[in-house]
UniProtKB/Swiss-Prot annotation:
Primary residence: cytoplasm
InterPro entries per the UniProt record, alphabetical: Methyltransf_25 (IPR041698), SAM-dependent_MTases_sf (IPR029063), Trans-aconitate_MeTrfase (IPR023506), Trans_acon_MeTrfase_C (IPR023149)
Localization per Swiss-Prot or TrEMBL: Cytoplasm
Protein family: Belongs to the methyltransferase superfamily. Tam family.
Organism classification: Bacteria, Pseudomonadati, Pseudomonadota, Alphaproteobacteria, Hyphomicrobiales
Protein name in UniProt: Trans-aconitate 2-methyltransferase
Function: Catalyzes the S-adenosylmethionine monomethyl esterification of trans-aconitate.
GO terms under biological process: methylation
Chain's gene name: tam
Keywords: Cytoplasm, Methyltransferase, S-adenosyl-L-methionine, Transferase
PANTHER family from the UniProt entry: TRANS-ACONITATE 2-METHYLTRANSFERASE, TRANS-ACONITATE 2-METHYLTRANSFERASE-RELATED
CDD domains: AdoMet_MTases (cd02440)
Length: 256
């Protein structure tokens, strides 16, 4: 599945806010080495550099289009193409930062444990993941997938990502290797111009695997069906806008 940096950037301010909120809870005054895991177009990497300076900060992602955008944004920063499912730092890092990436990896609990081993003493693993599979925006994806002439493509194997584990699972797995683990949820309510804007948002992330599976032949009809469902489930506010409710989970583990 190929990502689109330009589609992602349409709502960059809203997508960057959780990264900013996550970084604000990282209890490091200084660092020698920080890696932005799943750096995307470099918006979260830029936040790390703004706080700690550029020395020792790098990013990695598995998507060439995202990496190209990141390198244009931060030409003096090293960005590497890598698979987070198997990647491990070659030397201890003070900060491993992951904004909205690990929800795509079903075995991320195992990966978190491995990443803790790649931290320096007192180092931090900081993770944010969307926790929105129960929201109307994502329920409508499944309804559309199984309700149109493209439904045969979804019958044998679905594309819905796995639900996140409960906070207790993250805590139990991480505290064995950490001095402190903080876990919290934040629910963002993003004012969107209309239902079509919600569709544009998810076209850059959660809706992508559905569109890919439906195929180019059905793309426009799939989007029209999905938009109709979104219009029914997101009522207009007094100013004509709609509110996109967006829960996210945050995890900060300090190695000790």
């Amino acid at each position: 599945m190929a990502w689109s940096a330009s589609q992602y950037a349409k709502f960059e301010d809203e997508r960057t806010r959780p990264a900013r909120d996550l970084l604000a809870q990282v209890p490091l005054q200084h660092l020698r080495r920080a890696i932005d895991l799943g750096c995307g177009p470099g918006n979260s990497t830029e936040l790390i550099i703004e706080r700690y300076g550029a020395d020792g900060v790098s990013g990695l992602d598995s998507d060439a289009n995202m990496l190209e955008a990141a390198r244009k944004r931060l030409p003096g920063t090293a960005f590497v193409e890598a698979d987070l499912g198997s990647w491990q730092p070659t030397e201890p890092a003070d900060l491993l930062f992951a904004n909205a990436v690990f929800q795509w990896l079903p075995d991320h609990l195992d990966i978190f444990e491995r990443l803790m081993d790649g931290l320096s003493e007192g180092g931090v693993l900081a993770v944010q993941m969307p926790d929105n599979l129960g929201e109307p925006s994502h329920l409508a994806m499944e309804e559309t997938a199984h309700g149109g002439p493209w439904k045969a493509a979804f019958e044998e194997k679905g594309v819905r990502r796995q639900p996140l584990a409960p906070p207790s699972s993250y805590y139990s797995r991480l505290i064995a290797k950490a001095a402190r683990v903080d876990i919290w949820h934040t629910i963002y309510n993003h004012p969107m111009a209309d239902a079509a804007a919600i569709v544009e948002w998810v076209k850059g992330t959660g809706l992508m695997p559905y569109l890919a599976r439906a195929g180019e032949k059905h793309r426009e009809a799939f989007l029209a069906d999905y938009l109709e469902r979104i219009e029914k489930t997101y009522p207009k506010m007094s100013d004509g806008r709609v509110l996109l409710r967006f829960p996210r989970i945050f995890i900060v583990a300090v190695k000790g």
